[in-house]
Amino acid sequence: MRLLRFLAPLSLALAAGLPAQEHAPAPKRPIDWPALEREGVAVLRDYLRVNSTNPPGSELEAARFLRDFLAKEGIEAQILDTVELGAGRANLYARVKGNGSKRAIALVHHMDVVPAAASSWSVPPFSGMLRDGFIYGRGALDMKSEGIAQLMAVVALKRGGVPLTRDLVIIANPDEEWGSTGALTFADKHADLLRDVEFLFTEGGTNSVRNDTLLFRGIGVSEKRTFWQRLTVRGTPSHASRPTKDNPVPRLVAALDRLAKYETPLHVTPGVDRYFRDISRDYPGERGQWLRNVSSSLADPRAREWILSDVYWNAILRNTISLTGLQGSNKTNVIPPEASAEVDIRLLPDQNPDSVLATLKAVVADTAVRFTPLIVPKTPFESETNTDFFRAVERVSREHDPRAFVTSTMLTGATDRPMYRRLGIQVYGVDPFRTNDVDFQRGVHGND
């Protein structure tokens, strides 16, 4: 992960987003940005050395690391929910007071990381190595870097004595990568700590970068809902040398073939419509016209083919189905008693899970195929763009990247944002780094 001027834009976004004036208030004390960035790099490298692989998580050590760092800055942080979350796990909460004239803003990140196969890395995955301007480590992209950027932004404002009209709330959750139990527990148990929070930002932004130039900054206002299913067919076990008609494997394969060939309907949500209208400025001629009115353009075969050829655009315009796992016999010469498949289904925010499931069962058209949910879809949301926070990001982005614009985006993956959105908080995904979506997706759970 390369750090490129991330502290100043993020800090100023916070400061400019708090008062109503056009520009951020000046610090009472000078802020040495280069020194602060060097310090942020050092803190991030130390944070990456805390192994918080999930499972099992062990985020309590990470929470203590953050608490101790904040304590050195005179910011008291609380470690919460160690009993509820189980051994080695915890939430972290801190608050920097403003003058209270406006509601608070929350900066949230998750402390856990996905497993890393050390044999596939060129460096130890928990070394926090700095090489050729890049920091290597599991979590450098997802999302310890943004967590430290958030903390250093708050530290910059505090050291600079920048007057705040809103409290700044810092939250670090465990278990985002597995079950979101950290955010769920925090939102359920500590809603009183969030009652005055108007805006919350965390991961989930999508930027477009070309040749190190930011084309647009995508603020995540929604995300798709995870609706994983297991499909199972039962049969009679027997020796494979004598084929039977109730072998569950070919019956399951036939069902999966029908599912794989099914084209889910296209649907344009309001945030996605704005996204296409905004990015149309980067596409001259006919293609720009298609994007400016994407709903009607999808009825044009040529426009439809071009638009859906982009895997991200395709994913934000429909529910998606990916066949990801198969289980049959554990021996070649045995017809198994059961065959199953796991299917990754992602729903657009405004889609009804029960209706989608009924449609998929009709597509499979076989009552012998049993559908079992593997995960309950989270609360759907689409946050507003006509807000002080969104306008603050637009102002600061113009100051630092005048040629780039800000738009709303939909995340095709999942975050902890729904846990907080159901409390009435406007939640946003913000990527403060100059990282394009292709590199981000390749590296976020990948090697090095």
Regions found by a protein language model. Give the residues of each.
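Solvent-exposed loop/turn segments at secondary-structure junctions
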Residues: T53-P55, A87, G98-S101, M111-P115, ...
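Acidic/histidine-rich catalytic neighborhood of metal-dependent amide-processing enzymes
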Residues: F134-I135, L141-I219
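Extracytoplasmic/secreted proteins, especially bacterial periplasmic and envelope-associated proteins
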Residues: A35, E39-V43, E61, F65, ...
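Short, solvent-exposed loop/turn segments at the edges of secondary structure
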Residues: R89, K102, V123, T165, ...
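Metal-dependent amide/peptide-bond hydrolase catalytic core
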Residues: Q21-K28, T206-L215, I219-D448
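Acidic/His- and Gly-rich active-site-bordering loop/insert found
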Residues: E22-R138, K144-G147, L157-R166, V343
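Bacterial N-terminal signal peptides
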Residues: R5-G17
